[in-house]
């Protein structure tokens, strides 16, 4: 769920929408997956810590790669991950970095999230890579962004050098979250 539809950021609205989503999925064995910014994560941290369902945060929490691990709000995301209260997807590097094609400035963020709790990190492609760079009318079709998923996948060993760690990120953690196996 997008906690910031149209780029509007209102903590009260985000909190209410989150609670509505939780009510819908509670008791079904489902999780809530969010697209949000670090500022919203920071503001709602206490509420997120108390969710009765698993939380998945997309796109590195929408951190800005060029600002690194000390940017405002990143500590709140690390705290949620460290406490086992959120999974974070290492997905959509092209959303958080402008340094294509390898997005090297995303590496410190990925490494910090993995160090915080390797059992709460997932990897994803964000395929088919929708373009969310601006508002469009409901009649306009968003073009897809060209992203080399294979090349991004090849960054994972730099983010997680240990094969057992990569297995957690790619196999064990998704299996636990989605109930595979």
Where are the regions that the model predicts?
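H/E-rich (His + Asp/Glu) clusters that bind or coordinate divalent metals
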Residues: 70-181
């Amino acid at each position: 769920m997008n906690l910031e539809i149209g780029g509007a950021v209102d903590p009260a609205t985000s909190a209410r929408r989150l609670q509505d989503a939780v009510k819908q999925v509670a008791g079904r064995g489902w999780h809530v997956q969010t697209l949000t910014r670090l500022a919203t994560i920071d503001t709602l941290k206490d509420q997120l810590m108390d969710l009765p369902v698993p939380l998945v945060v997309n796109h590195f929490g929408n951190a800005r790669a060029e600002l690194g691990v000390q940017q405002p709000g990143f500590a709140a995301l690390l705290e949620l991950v460290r406490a086992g209260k959120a999974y974070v997807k290492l997905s959509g590097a092209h959303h958080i970095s402008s340094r294509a094609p390898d997005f090297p400035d995303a590496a410190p963020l990925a490494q910090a999230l993995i160090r915080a709790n390797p059992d709460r990190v997932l990897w994803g492609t964000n395929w088919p890579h929708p373009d969310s760079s601006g508002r469009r009318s409901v009649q306009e079709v968003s073009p897809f962004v060209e992203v080399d998923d294979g090349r991004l996948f090849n960054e994972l060993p730099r983010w997680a050098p240990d094969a057992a760690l990569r297995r957690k990120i790619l196999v064990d953690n998704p299996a636990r979250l989605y109930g595979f196996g």
